[in-house]
């Protein structure tokens, strides 16, 4: 099924320019949205709790900052860009008491609306504007006169103006320069979670760790195993990112290409596909989100235990040692203390 696409010519920037926008959160996406909205002539304030370390940064970058409740009271369009697990509490405590008839509540990801963790009143427009790239890229492309493709979706539209408003917002952060794709909260949420769990984070991580274990258990040096299954992964992913799977296969050696065709289906087979389908089902029926909520309500104990177990894997020890030799690799704060 073909998607519906929109560009700058389809968007009316004056719509969002005539509104007051509160951006709650100033992380990767929050700073990109806020600065680009301002540069597009939109009235914008940032909502951060008292004592937030980001407040000084917001002020230094020339934006107004106040508490989430105060900016929600001031605005008629609220973009909630806090972490998924914090959004329901922010909505209940700070946003919902300040919503008025005709306000719009926007999100950068559909999880809380799609799974009913946030239940907004019927007289409020509920929409989503989700750039398909990290915040620093969204901002850099905007400054360069370009843009990152965006998704838009409308879940609730009491006044029939939701799509035009979302498209105007997307244009104000540069999305319509590249292309805006119309989707639904259901489609964005379920595809995003599946991609993260089965392929991008969960699937790739376990593939790398298992490959490392197989090589080390066969007697190969951990350093050699690390280079072959983790370090070189970036080279392959970059080729796929730039030109798809065909570009990657064209660029690697014939030996690598031929071996990949033969062995790839032995690693990822029909049984793997069935388990991936089971993961998708757990996402669709809410099983995953119930566990996510239980983890948060339990003080993140399950997440912390999983993090600890993962950090203790031998590939992490080997990787830290090898990255000390790589002056060109940006080092995370956890490795520079």
From Swiss-Prot:
The active site is at residue 109. GO terms for biological process: isoleucine biosynthetic process; L-valine biosynthetic process. Pathway: Amino-acid biosynthesis; L-isoleucine biosynthesis; L-isoleucine from 2-oxobutanoate: step 2/4; Amino-acid biosynthesis; L-valine biosynthesis; L-valine from pyruvate: step 2/4. Residues 3-183 form the KARI N-terminal Rossmann domain. The keyword Zinc does not apply. Gene3D superfamilies: 6.10.240.10, NAD(P)-binding Rossmann-like Domain. The keyword NADP applies. Binds 2 magnesium ions per subunit. GO terms for cellular component: cytosol. Mg(2+) 1 binds at residues 192, 196. NADP(+) binds at residues 26-29, 49, 52, 54, 84-87, 135. It catalyses: (2R)-2,3-dihydroxy-3-methylbutanoate + NADP(+) = (2S)-2-acetolactate + NADPH + H(+); (2R,3R)-2,3-dihydroxy-3-methylpentanoate + NADP(+) = (S)-2-ethyl-2-hydroxy-3-oxobutanoate + NADPH + H(+). Involved in the biosynthesis of branched-chain amino acids (BCAA). Catalyzes an alkyl-migration followed by a ketol-acid reduction of (S)-2-acetolactate (S2AL) to yield (R)-2,3-dihydroxy-isovalerate. In the isomerase reaction, S2AL is rearranged via a Mg-dependent methyl migration to produce 3-hydroxy-3-methyl-2-ketobutyrate (HMKB). In the reductase reaction, this 2-ketoacid undergoes a metal-dependent reduction by NADPH to yield (R)-2,3-dihydroxy-isovalerate. NCBIfam families: ilvC (TIGR00465), PRK05479.1 (NF004017). Belongs to the ketol-acid reductoisomerase family. This is Ketol-acid reductoisomerase (NADP(+)). The lineage of its organism: Bacteria, Bacillati, Actinomycetota, Actinomycetes, Mycobacteriales. The gene is ilvC.
């Amino acid at each position: 099924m073909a998607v519906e696409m929109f560009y700058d010519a389809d968007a009316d920037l004056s719509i969002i320019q005539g509104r007051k926008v509160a951006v709650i959160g100033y992380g990767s996406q929050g700073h990109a949205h806020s600065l680009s909205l301002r540069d597009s002539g939109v009235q914008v304030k940032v909502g951060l709790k008292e004592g937030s370390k980001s407040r000084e940064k917001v002020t230094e970058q020339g934006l107004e900052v106040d508490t989430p409740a105060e900016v929600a009271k001031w605005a008629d369009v609220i973009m909630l860009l806090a972490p998924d697990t914090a959004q329901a509490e922010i909505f209940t405590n700070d946003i919902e008491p300040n919503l008025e008839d005709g306000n719009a509540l926007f999100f950068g990801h559909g999880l809380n609306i799609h799974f009913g963790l946030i239940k907004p009143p019927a007289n409020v427009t509920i929409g989503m504007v989700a750039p398909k790239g990290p915040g620093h890229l969204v901002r850099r492309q905007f400054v360069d006169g370009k843009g990152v493709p965006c998704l838009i979706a409308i879940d609730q539209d009491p006044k029939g103006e939701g799509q035009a408003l979302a498209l105007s917002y997307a244009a104000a952060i540069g999305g319509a320069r590249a292309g805006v794709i119309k989707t639904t909260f259901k489609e964005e949420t379920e595809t995003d979670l599946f991609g993260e769990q089965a392929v991008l984070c969960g699937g790739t991580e376990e593939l790398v760790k298992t490959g490392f274990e197989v090589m080390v258990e066969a007697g190969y040096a951990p350093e050699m195993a690390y280079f072959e299954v983790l370090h070189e992964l970036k080279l392959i992913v970059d080729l796929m990112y730039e030109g798809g799977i065909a570009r990657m296969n064209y660029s690697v050696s014939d030996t690598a290409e031929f071996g990949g065709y033969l062995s790839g289906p032995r690693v990822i087979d029909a049984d793997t596909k069935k388990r991936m389908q089971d993961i998708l089902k757990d996402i669709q029926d809410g099983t995953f989100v119930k566990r996510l909520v239980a983890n948060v309500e339990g003080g993140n104990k399950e997440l912390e235990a999983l993090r600890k177990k993962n950090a203790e894997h031998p590939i992490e020890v080997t990787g830290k040692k090898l990255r000390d030799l790589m002056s060109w690799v940006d080092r995370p704060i956890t490795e520079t203390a």
